[in-house]
Amino acid sequence: MDDELTLLPREKMLSFGITSLTDAELLALFLRTGTSGKSVFVLAQELLQHFGSLHGLLNANLDEFRYVEGIGLAKYAQLKGIAELARRYHSVRVLGDNPLLSPEMTKDFLQSQLSDAEREVFMVIFLDNQHRVVKHSRMFSGTLRHVEVHPREIVREAIKVNAAAVILAHNHPSGCAEPSKADKDITERIIKCCQFMDIHVLDHFIIGRGEYVSFAEQGWI
């Protein structure tokens, strides 16, 4: 264990595996260099402390970075690149022959797609009769507090891609995932619309900042 503590992140990863790295060490591995008078590891620690977590760091916008000493456009671009790489990884992972097996797996995917959105976005995952993803789409975009959703357009797209079921999702830019009455009402409208075409609504996820609510887990669907 003493040897592990004295190793640099890259050497530690090669010796003990990538999962042995702390968040700060993993971040330092990507940033590669520090700033004048500050090592990359110290920079990584300060970034995590400033933004509270990896999630907060990777979802921060350029204006928020302007207040962090030593972070220029190059470092900002690196961090946004990491976040986008993770988002695309999750996007590719759910397509193909692997079904969405659990709410946890679905939640991880949706957080990668929606948690950094600065306005409300309504997303739909279209699935076949074996719950394999045939398509996912950001169907509607709105304001900071509201997104207008059209159930018939969801049904039309589901028929177009021959989907047997859908999973609904939208984000709350405020960070609080608690559903509003409007969220519950639109879910009911979509369910009724889909029932006419024998399309099942499996769940509706609300994605906040580091939290989520699943309508299915709550027994609302």
From Swiss-Prot:
Pfam family, one: RadC
Keyword entries, A-Z: Hydrolase, Metal-binding, Metalloprotease, Protease, Zinc
GO MF annotation terms: metal ion binding; metallopeptidase activity
Domain MPN: 99-221
Binding site for Zn(2+): 170, 172, 183
PROSITE patterns: MPN (PS50249), UPF0758 (PS01302)
Gene Ontology biological process terms from the UniProt entry: proteolysis
Classification via Gene3D superfamilies: 5' to 3' exonuclease, C-terminal subdomain, Cytidine Deaminase, domain 2
Keyword Chloroplast: no
InterPro entries: MPN (IPR037518), RadC_JAB (IPR025657), RuvA_2-like (IPR010994), UPF0758 (IPR001405), UPF0758_CS (IPR020891), UPF0758_N (IPR046778), UPF0758_YicR (IPR022820)
Residue ranges annotated as motif JAMM motif: 170-183
PANTHER family: DNA REPAIR PROTEIN RADC, UPF0758 PROTEIN YEES-RELATED
NCBIfam families in alphabetical order: PRK00024.1, radc
Protein family membership: Belongs to the UPF0758 family. YicR subfamily.
Protein name: UPF0758 protein Ent638_0101
